[in-house]
Curated annotation (Swiss-Prot):
Residues 26-376 are lumenal. This is N-acetyllactosaminide alpha-1,3-galactosyltransferase. The chain crosses the membrane at residues 7-25. InterPro entries: Glyco_trans_6, Nucleotide-diphossugar_trans.
Length: 376
């Protein structure tokens, strides 16, 4: 075959191949097999398979990725909502309180309030709950006259060590002479505020007037600064952790000398003329005014009602046997406390140490009345 014949043959073969290829790719079976196994059913252009596959893959991939992101976000949202719900939910008594662990003592009152003894509470559950709340606890203390020099420094030092460890605390210190304040060094999360008040001529009046003063400070600033507030006598010392197990709406302290006595033996005010009067046959416990507390609003109510009774007695020319403590007992008889602290939280070692006192949280200081009760 000559050169011209070969050229013609080559052209025929090439034309045949082109025609066959063109028919194939436009047939129902033709495709770019390495990209997609069938033609785009909507687009007849040979470029359609590639043009459809790339954006479709990208868009589908993005859609799946977005769905995964949305699922993750929804799960995070659900967990956050659950955490916020847990934070808002009130801690239930039986979540942390096990009264049957102390069968030898009274652990629940007739009105179902807990009496907190060592061994009846779960510290871990309580700490976890209150840590989430980010609480601040206030503590008022009065150091008037010689009480300042004899007791204040040790009281604050021991409170700094044992009172509400790990939580923010504000000490409200009431003195009649700021210049005699000892230097105070406090740990992290602790601060103090000092207020100068008038010294009364009688220690009884100092004791009773504190109700008025505490109420005034709650109204002007304390209610905006703390979540819970305790009011304590200065002539005692912390010896072990006084923690969040003591927190409640209204908290009363059992008096160490009377916690086993019959109510008819209590030294309640028995004279009908007094606003603090409690007749024989009535009464639940004898409460110690050395420690009481609760939410600021409830403590405000306690102090206002007690001071109202004190003023009524003054008007009627009578003074309750145990002054503000008598009025406090009358208040808690009418307005039952939501939580009671066992004598372990305010113990007098002169009683000894009976078997039901497992650990002493606060102890009374030696009462040097002949030295400290002259406040002039």
């Amino acid at each position: 075959m000559n050169v011209k014949g070969k050229a013609i043959l080559s052209m025929l073969v090439a034309s045949t191949v082109i025609v066959v290829f063109w028919e194939y790719i436009n047939s129902s079976e033709g495709s770019f097999l390495w990209i997609y196994h069938s033609k785009n059913p909507e687009v007849g252009d040979v470029r359609a398979p590639m043009g459809w596959w790339f954006p479709s893959w990208f868009n589908n991939g993005t859609h799946i990725y977005q769905e995964e992101e949305e699922d993750v976000d929804k799960e995070k949202g659900r967990k956050k909502e659950q955490r916020e719900k847990d934070d808002r939910e009130e801690l239930q008594l039986w979540d942390w309180f096990t009264p049957e662990k102390r069968p030898e003592v009274v652990t629940v009152t007739s009105w179902k309030a807990p009496v907190v003894w060592e061994g009846t509470y779960n510290s871990a559950i309580l700490e976890n709950y209150y840590a989430k709340q980010k609480i601040t606890v206030g503590l008022t203390v009065f150091a008037i006259g010689k009480y300042l020099e004899y007791y204040l420094e040790e009281f604050i030092a021991s409170a700094d060590r044992y009172f509400m460890v790990g939580h923010k605390v504000i000490f409200y210190i009431m003195v009649n002479n700021v210049s005699r304040m000892p230097p105070l060094e406090l740990g992290p999360l602790r601060s103090f505020e000092v207020f100068e008040i008038k010294a009364e001529k009688r220690w009884q009046d100092v004791s009773m007037m504190r109700m008025k003063i505490i109420g005034e400070h709650i109204l002007t600033h304390i209610q905006h600064e703390v979540d819970f507030l305790f009011c304590m006598d200065v002539d005692q010392v912390f010896q072990d952790n006084f923690g969040v197990e003591t927190l409640g709406e209204s908290v009363a302290q059992l008096q160490a000398w009377w916690y086993k006595a019959d109510p008819n033996e209590f030294t309640y005010e028995r004279r009908e003329k007094s606003a603090a009067y409690i007749p024989f046959g009535q009464g639940d416990f004898y409460y110690h005014a050395a420690i009481f507390g609760g939410t600021p609003i409830r403590v405000l109510n306690i102090t206002q009602e007690c001071f109202k009774g004190i003023l009524q007695d003054k008007k009627n020319d009578i003074e309750a046997n145990w002054h503000d403590e008598s009025h406090l007992n009358k208040y808690f008889l009418v307005n039952k406390p939501s939580k009671i602290l066992s004598p372990e939280y305010c113990w007098d070692y002169q009683i000894g140490l009976p078997s039901d006192i497992k650990i002493v949280k606060i102890s009374w200081q030696t009462k040097e009345y002949h030295l400290v009760r002259n406040n002039v």
